[in-house]
Amino acid sequence: MRIRSATPSLILLVIAIVFFVLAICTPPLANNLTLGKYGDVRFGVFGYCLNSNCSKPLVGYNSDYLDEHAKDGFRTSVIVRQRASYGLVIVPVSACICLISTIMTIFAHIGAIARSPGFFNVIGTITFFNIFITAIAFVICVITFVPHIQWPSWLVLANVGIQLIVLLLLLVARRQATRLQAKHLRRATSGSLGYNPYSLQNSSNIFSTSSRKGDLPKFSDYSAEKPMYDTISEDDGLKRGGSVSKLKPTFSNDSRSLSSYAPTVREPVPVPKSNSGFRFPFMRNKPAEQAPENPFRDPENPFKDPASAPAPNPWSINDVQANNDKKPSRFSWGRS
């Protein structure tokens, strides 16, 4: 069993059970340990003994026996002590509850239960109520035997402090269990939703380039042949370090290459720089500083972007008709 956050609580609860056993093993069950002693009379949880003569195990003391052998020397009356003696049965009841808490703390060391905060809540609740029960049992011991109280009665008080420390340790163990549960849920979620780099480890052979014609059925055997219409030579004539211009296609009936159809880039007209940033209006209208007029500018919409306008088509029907109208016709009727 691994050492967990509930291990200190388990050790303290075992010590508390030992103290409860010492407090219960009193007359008439054992003659050596006593909760209270007056002369030759020794009192325990379930009875009393006079020298070697002990009473039968019972709940509560006989009032006649107290009047005869233990009437004087106590701070409380015989009636109060006789009624309070019935409350001594709370000591074994508190010991049984402490035993239940100890068994549950042992189960708290199991992997699944160790991550359950609710399980620690149950143990803490049982221990919390047992603290009050043990405290009541000690008060009854004081009322019954003071000032002749013996050290086994003080063990009941020690169990009150031990169980109080156990309660604080259970709160710490519950906090640790909450963290373990959250960590376990994160691992489970990341394993199902997250990317696992080892998921393709066993299927890495799908990327192998080895031939699989031997283990494939006949209907799945295939072969890829070069099509007949593919007449392009594999050797394009371009060697490493050669010029890329060799790959530019040209027309058979035209000596112009594709580079001749590329649009010409107009260089901007250089504007002379003035010495100062401020210029007068008459200095801004110099012809040298004016940009050339854009031939593609629309006079009706001068602020329109010429790039968005369609390029002029010199082979349109309207332009062809306009050019034909401008040329003089050579057709004549009759002979010249």
Curated annotation (Swiss-Prot):
Keyword annotations: Cytoplasm, Meiosis
The record describes the protein's role as: Has a role in meiosis.
> Which intervals carry biased composition (Polar residues)?
250-262
Main location class: cytoplasm
Would you tell me the protein name for this molecule?
Answer: Meiotically up-regulated gene 33 protein
Highest taxon of the lineage: Eukaryota
Cellular compartment(s): Cytoplasm
The opening ranks of the lineage are: Eukaryota, Fungi, Dikarya, Ascomycota, Taphrinomycotina
**Which species does this protein come from?**
Schizosaccharomyces pombe (strain 972 / ATCC 24843)
Question: Which GO biological process annotations does it have?
Answer: meiotic cell cycle
Cellular component aspect of the GO annotation = cell division site; cell tip; cytoplasm; endocytic vesicle; exocytic vesicle; growing cell tip; plasma membrane; plasma membrane of cell tip
Spell out the residue ranges making up region: Disordered. Answer: 232-336
